[in-house]
């Protein structure tokens, strides 16, 4: 992965998490997974973290336990959303765990909680504020719906943001309805037929007043160590996780 000089890898037994050392110093843990180091069989090989894509549930649960162990959070207090490509927010409170409802933005001020989103081309966005952290699932529909701006509003003053691995314009040709929707929101379009969710998320963050933004250079379709729905169709999901420390 290529993020910034402060990003580093942790993990063992083939599992690798990318984290940010500066974030840890500021009291937030953030972790990005790829597809390596799990127990799922093809086409979900191997660190699939999604239970609703056709994989065996016990394997998904083991994969989540492995990630939690490597990252140092309690999987019993992991909160996820049923992602619907919109902009609905759910605040995760002490004691919330599992699938907490339909949303594409999760925010928490609870130090016992870990929040997570799952992706396979959409851009995962981490937002950090004073005593609060949020995650945004930013696919093209969510970007057009204003999910990033909604996440910023839910966080309050955003001190820093991270945009994780997503599909890039090189691999993401879309139809005219997507191009029209992006242009209507002043989101970037490449060559009149391609979009980049990560770059669009960064533009939306800047428009919402966020100044400190780290953006991954990884294209999930180009890099086969990541799950990509556009490239593979039926496949698994990598995860992005955040917790207050």
Locations of regions flagged by a protein language model:
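Active-site microenvironment for binding and transforming phosphate-containing groups
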Residues: 1-245
